[in-house]
Amino acid sequence: MSDILQTILARKAEEVAQRRAQRPLEELQAAVASAPPVRGFVRALQAAVANGDPAVIAEVKKASPSKGVIRPDFRPADIAVSYEFGGASCLSVLTDVDFFQGADAYLQQAREACTLPVLRKDFVIDAYQVYEARVLGADCILLIVAALDDTQLATLSELALSLGMDVLVEVHDIDELERALQVPAPMIGINNRNLRTFEVSLQTTLDMQQAVPRDRLLVTESGILGLQDVALMRDAGIHAFLVGEAFMRVEEPGEGLRQLFFAA
């Protein structure tokens, strides 16, 4: 398949093999014991929703395959502080190097600069990356259903939960949602961006929301750019958001967050 996701996954498999060669799995597993305590990612989102507020996962993202460099002046620690002041519940930090110009160090810098729980935003395909996420200080990992078979999805989710992390299981269509619901993770992310074409439609979330059980926190991801987008989702009963680009394009990301979600 010659789509963007498959290209990314092929490269990710090579990257994981290279990392294993540099740092054996056993060494990584041993390092988990000295990882910083988890901060409670889902708990932070649920607390915001229970309070009647939007629960915002604010993304720390330098670039993307579809848009190129989004934020040339990229300082993860400053961005994290700005987001915390702006009212974010959690952070999402891109760590994919080749396609998003991310880095593991960006996650560490962002987390050390604030008190918010942090999602490691990457293409997780191997248990090695789950241990790696915990050692880096991640409080949550992303599992993309389109990138995994059912066995991988179950195994990686179970491992992450056993290490104390939360899991955001990401879907784009009903078939993927049915697979995601077999995993006992408390969050379902509906990505409005098709990872095979990178086209975006907010209707994706609206069409699928009724199929998400009430005991799962629904997070809408991608394409939330303006006040009308937020109003559309909140009117539909969706109160958890993952937003990056809209904030990365303004000088003060936290102020962008406040204006989009808390100015009214």
Swiss-Prot record:
Q: Which Gene3D superfamilies match?
A: Aldolase class I
Task: Name the gene for this chain.
Answer: trpC
Q: Which PANTHER family match?
A: INDOLE-3-GLYCEROL-PHOSPHATE SYNTHASE, TRYPTOPHAN BIOSYNTHESIS PROTEIN
Top-level EC class as recorded in UniProt = lyase
Which pathway does the UniProt entry assign to this protein? Amino-acid biosynthesis; L-tryptophan biosynthesis; L-tryptophan from chorismate: step 4/5
Using the record, list the residue span of the signal peptide; answer none if the entry has no such feature.
none
Name of this protein? Indole-3-glycerol phosphate synthase
Q: Can you state which reaction this protein catalyses?
A: 1-(2-carboxyphenylamino)-1-deoxy-D-ribulose 5-phosphate + H(+) = (1S,2R)-1-C-(indol-3-yl)glycerol 3-phosphate + CO2 + H2O
Q: Which NCBIfam families match?
A: PRK00278.1-2 (NF001370), PRK00278.1-6 (NF001373), PRK00278.2-4 (NF001377)
Q: Which family does it belong to?
A: Belongs to the TrpC family.
Q: Which Pfam families match?
A: IGPS
List the EC numbers from the record. Answer: 4.1.1.48
* A GO biological process held by the record: L-tryptophan biosynthetic process
> Keyword Lyase, does the record have it?
yes
**Which GO molecular function annotations are given, in alphabetical order?**
indole-3-glycerol-phosphate synthase activity; phosphoribosylanthranilate isomerase activity
The record's section on InterPro entries has:
Aldolase_TIM (IPR013785), Indole-3-glycerol_P_synth (IPR045186), Indole-3-glycerol_P_synth_dom (IPR013798), Indole-3-GlycerolPSynthase_CS (IPR001468), RibuloseP-bd_barrel (IPR011060)
Could you list this entry's UniProt keywords, alphabetically sorted: Amino-acid biosynthesis, Aromatic amino acid biosynthesis, Decarboxylase, Lyase, Tryptophan biosynthesis
